[in-house]
Every structure is written in structure tokens, then in C-alpha cells.
Curated annotation (Swiss-Prot):
Domain PPIase cyclophilin-type residues, every copy: 1-198
The EC number(s) this enzyme carries: 5.2.1.8
GO biological process: protein folding
Name this polypeptide is given: Peptidyl-prolyl cis-trans isomerase-like 3
Top EC class of this enzyme: isomerase
Swiss-Prot/TrEMBL catalytic activity: [protein]-peptidylproline (omega=180) = [protein]-peptidylproline (omega=0)
Disulfide bonds: none
A cellular-component GO term for this protein: catalytic step 2 spliceosome
Record's function text: PPIases accelerate the folding of proteins. It catalyzes the cis-trans isomerization of proline imidic peptide bonds in oligopeptides.
Pfam families: Pro_isomerase
Signal peptide positions (record): none
Length: 212
């Protein structure tokens, strides 16, 4: 199953591991389908490690998002985003050694700690962390994340010869304003310094086994 992330720096063609991690894949595809990722930034980056995006609270999500049940209405999406299962937890789907952070271009969920198992988004949590809408893509193998984050896909175009070209390298080398914690400040119109905007413009779904 595949999608294309149309980014500010070109198209990332992504294969999803729907059979191995069905809940994670369904969550990602549903958020893609309703436009939740449209016009959202990549808000963290560490060249040589990873780039992170998918915070649906940061983008101008369309009104269609509130038709995705049990998703919250657009104006009630919590800071950091949430999964389609809200207020229930989207638990980790760890599969070792089959799915690991063992290469460049691995797509994985950015988890958050569970502080209160009765809180919205954490209800029914089975582990110390849960997933929401945020994800990251590795720039290199990151074995220290194995067992901690859910791998659910991989980027297919990783070289200049691949269809679409090596877009991940363009993102990694973009001229950005970044703080010590890797947080990206998107440039303002007319701002000096030549900084680039970086994010997801839209998503095309090529196959969705969960569509009804």
C-alpha cells in the first residue's frame, strides 16, 4: 500500500506496512484521506538522524476533518495532534526483528508518554507510550529506537535515479532556522536570511485497504 507526500521540496513516495501494523496504518491513511496532514510543517529536524512532522494541530485542517469519527472537531484538536481513535489510545505496534529503524527512509511514529490512563488519547493504553498523528522519517539507521517507536513504512525514492528523485536529501539539506532542540521556525514573508519553508502540502493515496 502506498501514498505520496507532496512536500515543499518534492514528492516522497512511501510504502506502508498495513498488514504488519494495521491500526497504525489505518490511522495514518485516515488522516491522509481527510486532509489532516495538508499544509502541516515538518517541525523538527536533526540532519543525520531524522525529520518529524504530522502535528495536525499546526496546520489549517479542512472542515472535513470533523466528519472523521471519533476524531475531535477541528477546533478541539489538542496541541501535538491526536489519532483517529481519540479519546482511546493508539497503542504501539512493535514488531522485532521484522520492523526496525535499520536504514535511511524509515517511517515511524513519534510517541508520547502516558501520564494519566484516564485522560483523552490515553484511555486503554497498554504501555508507557502511545501514538497520535505525528511521525518521523529517518535520515540514517537509528537502532536505539527499535522497540520504542512503531515502524509503519519506508520511503521508496532515495536516490536521484528513483522516480521523483532523492527528495529526502533535499529536505535534510534545506536552509532552515532551527534551535538546539531541532525545532524549526518557519520563515515569515520578507524575512532576511534566505530560510526555507518545509512541510507537507498535500497527500495522494494510491491504495487504501481500510477505505469503506
Amino acid at each position: 500500500m502506498s501514498v505520496t507526500l507532496h512536500t515543499t521540496h518534492g514528492d516522497l513516495k512511501v510504502e506502508l506496512f498495513c498488514e504488519a501494523v494495521p491500526q497504525t496504518a489505518e490511522n495514518f491513511l485516515a488522516l491522509c484521506a481527510c486532509g489532516a496532514y495538508n499544509n502541516t510543517p515538518f517541525h523538527r529536524i536533526f540532519p543525520g538522524f531524522m525529520i518529524q512532522g504530522g502535528d495536525i494541530s499546526l496546520g489549517p485542517a479542512p472542515g472535513t476533518l470533523n466528519t472523521l469519527k471519533p476524531m475531535l472537531p477541528v477546533n478541539e484538536i489538542p496541541k501535538g495532534g491526536t489519532s483517529i481513535y481519540h479519546p482511546r489510545a493508539l497503542n504501539q505496534e512493535i514488531h522485532l526483528p521484522a520492523l526496525r529503524h535499520n536504514a535511511r527512509g524509515i517511517l515511524s511514529m513519534a510517541s508520547r508518554p502516558v501520564k494519566d490512563r484516564t485522560a483523552p488519547g490515553s484511555q486503554g493504553a497498554t504501555g508507557a507510550t502511545v501514538n497520535g498523528s505525528q511521525f518521523f522519517i529517518t535520515f540514517a539507521a537509528a537502532p536505539h529506537l527499535d522497540g520504542a517507536s512503531t515502524v509503519f513504512g519506508k520511503v521508496l525514492n532515495l536516490s536521484p535515479q528513483d522516480e521523483g528523485g532523492d527528495v529526502l536529501s533535499k529536505l535534510e539539506k534545506a536552509k532552515l532556522k532551527v534551535d538546539k532542540k531541532g525545532r524549526v521556525t518557519q520563515p515569515k514573508e520578507g524575512e532576511e536570511g534566505g530560510y526555507e519553508a518545509i512541510g507537507i502540502n498535500s497527500v495522494t493515496i494510491h491504495a487504501n485497504p481500510f477505505a469503506k
